[in-house]
């Protein structure tokens, strides 16, 4: 692709007249510049009908070429950012999966909690940035279990009070792990407080009502719902209806 000025489009065989005929719009002149990334055309900048019935000239073309270069850089940077974000999310999923494999009773738990959390976020009409933050928080909500012994995670019987206290520490441990990563600090409330309860009987800080961050409330509901509707060694899964009523 190369930059192009067409000041008599009606005489150019490449010009499609159908649009003008249907819209009753008169195309007098056109300037087109390819948007390239590493010699690959990824788009086109186009303008038609310069103001005051003037014709496009070489100065206009030079300006458009410069603008196309800036657009190409912006689009390529956006692509690279999306790829980096996706790679990070996949890494987080792999970490969560590795932790999950230590506990034979929670297969697929992280994936379901993430799905439920995003469904709640959609219902609440959260912003895209809030959904991205929530998605990562849901994936990493149990990352602190990396510091819990296998014999406790895999225990089929009800936990002793001491073992339960050990399990409860996974929320704070998860927050401590993530606070060293500056880009993840916004998700820490969802990880640290996803076992808090509206009545203040949760852990680790006994938050109550509006003290709980929204991100933590959403992950808490998703996490609890999944725990209630899946089989555990000490009880059978509840029906979706019963779980919803209890929640």
Annotate the PLM regions.
Residues 38, 44-55, 156:
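Short beta-strand-to-loop transition segments that serve as allosteric relay/switch motifs
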Residues 28-37:
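A short, aliphatic-rich beta-strand micro-motif
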Residues 65-72:
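Allosteric cytosolic regulatory segments
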Residues 4-29, 49-54, 197-208:
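Signal-transducing coupling segments at domain and membrane junctions
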Residues 7, 24, 58, 89-247:
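Metal-dependent catalytic cores of enzymes that make or break cyclic nucleotides
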């Amino acid at each position: 692709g190369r930059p192009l000025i067409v000041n008599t489009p009606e005489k150019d065989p490449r010009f499609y007249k159908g649009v003008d005929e249907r819209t009753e719009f008169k195309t007098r002149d056109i300037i087109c510049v390819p948007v390239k990334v590493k010699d690959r055309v990824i788009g086109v900048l186009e303008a038609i009908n310069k103001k005051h019935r003037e014709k496009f000239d070489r100065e206009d073309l030079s300006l458009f070429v410069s603008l196309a270069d800036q657009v190409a850089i912006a689009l390529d940077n956006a692509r690279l950012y999306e790829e980096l974000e996706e790679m990070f999310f996949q890494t987080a999923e792999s970490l969560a999966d590795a932790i999950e494999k230590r506990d034979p009773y929670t297969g697929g738990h992280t994936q379901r909690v993430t799905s439920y959390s995003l469904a709640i976020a959609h219902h609440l009409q959260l912003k895209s940035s809030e959904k991205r933050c929530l998605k990562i928080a849901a994936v990493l909500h149990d990352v602190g279990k990396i510091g819990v012994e296998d014999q406790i995670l895999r225990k089929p019987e009800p936990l002793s009070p001491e073992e339960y206290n050990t399990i409860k520490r996974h929320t704070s441990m998860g927050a401590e792990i993530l606070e060293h990563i500056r880009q993840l600090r916004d998700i820490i409330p969802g990880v640290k407080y996803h076992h808090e309860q509206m009545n203040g009987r949760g852990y680790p800080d006994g938050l109550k009502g509006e003290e709980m961050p929204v991100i933590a409330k959403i992950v808490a509901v998703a996490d609890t719902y999944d725990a209630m509707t899946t089989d555990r060694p000490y009880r059978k899964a509840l029906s979706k209806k019963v779980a919803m009523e209890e929640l």
